[in-house]
Amino acid sequence: MRHRKSGRQLNRNSSHRQAMFRNMASSLVRHEIIKTTLPKAKELRRVVEPLITLAKTDSVANRRLAFARTRDNEIVAKLFNELGPRFASRAGGYTRILKCGFRAGDNAPMAYIELVDRSVSQTEEVATAE
């Protein structure tokens, strides 16, 4: 019985799942919007939001915790120098999930996950890329 077990398995073992979400979290912090399947986007929210909350108080200990979760110094720097101050007045809800149809190959539901206070220039950049 799987009583009280939270989180989705996504047909992966635990190390693969951890590596996948670490990479996806880094991509989301770097680009501030990514396109993925809807279940992955919903699960990624549970990884990224605590990282941004951690980045709101800049300390060596918090930077080390963020590095332990992302393993990327560039991402840690962006979290604490840009995203932490940007979301300082917001009490959670840093990401937005937008459904965007179904994937052609397997009809999987797709979604964009983005940071809510993204700048307009990045929105135009994504629109021109597609």
Swiss-Prot record:
<protein>
    <recommendedName>
        <fullName>Large ribosomal subunit protein bL17</fullName>
    </recommendedName>
</protein>
<dbReference type="Pfam" id="PF01196">
    <property type="entry name" value="Ribosomal_L17"/>
</dbReference>
<keyword id="KW-0687">Ribonucleoprotein</keyword>
<dbReference type="InterPro" id="IPR036373">
    <property type="entry name" value="Ribosomal_bL17_sf"/>
</dbReference>
<dbReference type="GO" id="GO:0003735">
    <property type="term" value="F:structural constituent of ribosome"/>
</dbReference>
<dbReference type="InterPro" id="IPR047859">
    <property type="entry name" value="Ribosomal_bL17_CS"/>
</dbReference>
<comment type="similarity">
    <text>Belongs to the bacterial ribosomal protein bL17 family.</text>
</comment>
<keyword id="KW-0689">Ribosomal protein</keyword>
<dbReference type="GO" id="GO:0006412">
    <property type="term" value="P:translation"/>
</dbReference>
<comment type="subunit">
    <text>Part of the 50S ribosomal subunit. Contacts protein L32.</text>
</comment>
<dbReference type="InterPro" id="IPR000456">
    <property type="entry name" value="Ribosomal_bL17"/>
</dbReference>
<dbReference type="GO" id="GO:0022625">
    <property type="term" value="C:cytosolic large ribosomal subunit"/>
</dbReference>
